[in-house]
Amino acid sequence: MADTRILPSQSNPEEGGVKRRALLAGAVGLTAAALLPAGMVHAEGFLMPEVPPLEKEDYAEARKRFHTNLLRKGPSPEKSEPLGTPAGAKRVTYPGGPDGSIELIAWLSHYEPTGKPKPAVLFLHGGNATGDGHWELVKGYWEAGFVVLHPSFRGENGQEGNYSGFYDETADALAAATYLENLPGIDKNRFFIAGHSNGGTLSLLAAMTRKFRAAAPISAGVNSWRYFARFEREARFDEENPKEFIMRSSVCFGPSLKCPTLLLRGTEERPFDADHQLLMDRVKTAGTPIDAKLLPGNHNGVVPGAVQESIKFFNQFT
């Protein structure tokens, strides 16, 4: 039977909607494609808009009213070991989780507060867990004079909390940002955000919620429908509610981006696509600078070079 899930703005006023038309179509032999609402395509278990909608509301305001509905609750889908303390890092905790109720582990680069405040980078890891290898990737930042905080998120590495797939994790990232910028000796006017893969996705959502000096998402996703079509088992929220996807998709909130941004990606990974271009077009309507750059490497191999490129970008604002 045809999927009955559709966006409210594209619903059919006819009683019974898509489900009723599916039954009628079965009687006359129409193809499944003919049953889809205009502008929608089939994904894995849900319908996906051909063009992601543009939300009029600012993302920060939308987050105040929206609460994700998790139908399945549990830890991150990625198996991982408990976190230790890698070389060059200080293990700290920050108040993440629901309303700051969970103490989550983060790694902070060693630094000494001085009379001159230091620039800082919040770096969000890829995947759905972290480890020493992720910390090694951010070494370039603290070698370049930035204080770096690398947070873990709820449900990762044996910690408390429920994995939500980008939404509640954004709240954790924002809590980590507040923790970092309020440390002694941190320059709030030179406070940056970066991240790789899933962390790049989160860095965009975070930069649409509050202001950073600049952002450098690496290999970021901008369309959550596409992500969860690939990783359907990670969708633990109510897939019948299109708002769940919208609130995880930065492309739907382009004008909300609150700082200059450089999108980075590897030449050997899935290229920038129409969704990235749509995001950039929507961001520019608000007058916020945004650019994209390809660097040599695949999805993981691009990270060291991208970190160096982000340092060059951030140094424009220091």
Identify the function of each model-found stretch.
Residues 164-183:
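Alpha/beta-hydrolase active-site loop
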Residues 115-118, 124-160:
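Short substrate-entry loop that stabilizes the transition state in hydrolases
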